UniProtKB/Swiss-Prot annotation:
Coiled-coil zones: none
Disulfide bridge partners, by residue number: 38-73, 69-127, 116-136
Name this polypeptide is given: General odorant-binding protein 2
GO BP term, example: sensory perception of smell
Annotated keywords: Disulfide bond, Olfaction, Sensory transduction, Signal, Transport
Record-annotated membrane-spanning stretches: none
InterPro entries: Odorant/phero-bd_Lep, PBP/GOBP, PBP_GOBP_sf
Signal peptide start-end: 1-20
GO molecular function: odorant binding
Tissue expression pattern: Detected in antenna (at protein level). Expressed at high levels in antenna.
Stored CDD domains: PBP_GOBP
Length: 160
C-alpha cells in the first residue's frame, strides 16, 4: 500500500511538472508572436531573431542587449511591465492565467521573475537588466522543471 501511495505521489508530481511546462509553452508561443513587430524598434538582428525561436534550448545564450530591448517592447504590447521597466505583477499573473491551465504556473512564474529582477535591480540600463533577468529566469525555470521543450512550443505555436 505504501509503495502505491509513493507511485501516486510521483505520478502527480510528474503530471504537475509536465502541466507547467505545457503552460509555459503556450505563454512562450503567444509572447513570441510579437517579436517580429519589436525587431526593428529594438535593433535586434535577423540572426538573433531567428535564434530566439530556440530561447529554451541549451544552445541559445540569452546575452544580447538588443534582446532585452525586444523583450521590453514585447512586454509592453501586453502591459506586462510597469513604467519603471519592471514586471507588473498583477498583469503578468492575469496574462499567464489566460492560457489553458495557466493557474498552475502563474504564481511560480511571477515569483521566479521577481526574484531574478531583485538580483539585477542595480543595473541602470533597462535593456541590459531585462536580458539578464531573462537569462536568470530561463536558468531558474530549468531548475524548477517548468521550462518547455522546443517541440512543445512548436506544437502550440499555430494557435497564436
Amino acid at each position: 500500500m505504501f509503495s502505491f501511495l509513493i507511485l501516486v505521489f510521483v505520478a502527480s508530481v510528474a503530471d504537475s511538472v509536465i502541466g507547467t511546462a505545457e503552460v509555459m509553452s503556450h505563454v512562450t508561443a503567444h509572447f513570441g508572436k510579437t517579436l517580429e513587430e519589436c525587431r526593428e524598434e529594438s535593433g535586434l538582428s535577423v540572426d538573433i531573431l531567428d535564434e530566439f525561436k530556440h530561447f529554451w534550448s541549451d544552445d541559445f545564450d540569452v546575452v544580447h542587449r538588443e534582446l532585452g530591448c525586444a523583450i521590453i517592447c514585447m512586454s509592453n504590447k501586453f502591459s506586462l511591465m510597469d513604467d519603471d521597466v519592471r514586471m507588473h505583477h498583477v498583469n503578468m499573473d492575469e496574462y499567464i492565467k489566460g492560457f489553458p491551465n495557466g493557474q498552475v504556473l502563474a504564481e511560480k512564474m511571477v515569483k521566479l521573475i521577481h526574484n531574478c529582477e531583485k538580483q539585477f535591480d542595480t543595473e541602470t540600463d533597462d535593456c541590459t537588466r531585462v536580458v539578464k533577468v531573462a537569462a536568470c529566469f530561463k536558468k531558474d525555470s530549468r531548475k524548477e522543471g517548468i521550462a518547455p521543450e522546443v517541440a512543445m512550443i512548436e506544437a502550440v505555436i499555430e494557435k497564436y
